[in-house]
């Protein structure tokens, strides 16, 4: 069951990263990845649709996945988005005051990797 959860978590994370970074991908990478991750098509179905080998689809999806993780590791856009959402929730629910909010917001914006 743990393997299934890890696979599901990885798929969900890839889907989120794809939404953030998809404009940095080629058209083919976007097409194959969207069909595989978001539309849940199999490698064979994608290969048939584009008249290419299943291996070519697998290679593209694998490279795209690695690229998405690499982009997040370098740019941290998903992580920053999560921090900003958390900050907004805290200010809306009065868990922090304006001064704390602004200080934390500056830290997120000027965050050094």
UniProtKB/Swiss-Prot annotation:
Q: Name one Pfam family in it.
A: UPF0122
State the superkingdom. Bacteria
- Which segments cross the bilayer? none
What function does the entry list?
Might take part in the signal recognition particle (SRP) pathway. This is inferred from the conservation of its genetic proximity to ftsY/ffh. May be a regulatory protein.
Q: Which family does it belong to?
A: Belongs to the UPF0122 family.
Designated name of the protein: UPF0122 protein MCAP_0480
Q: Which organism does this record belong to?
A: Mycoplasma capricolum subsp. capricolum (strain California kid / ATCC 27343 / NCTC 10154)
């Amino acid at each position: 069951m743990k393997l299934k959860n890890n696979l599901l978590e990885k798929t969900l994370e890839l889907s989120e990263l794809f939404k953030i970074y998809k404009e940095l991908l080629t058209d083919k990478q976007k097409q194959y990845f969207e069909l595989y991750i978001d539309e849940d098509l199999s490698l064979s179905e994608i290969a048939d649709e584009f008249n290419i080998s299943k291996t070519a689809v697998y290679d593209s999806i694998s490279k795209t996945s690695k690229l998405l993780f690499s982009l997040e590791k370098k740019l941290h856009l998903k992580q920053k988005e999560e921090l900003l959402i958390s900050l907004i929730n805290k200010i809306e629910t009065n868990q922090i005051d304006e001064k704390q909010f602004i200080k934390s917001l500056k830290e997120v914006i000027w965050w050094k990797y």
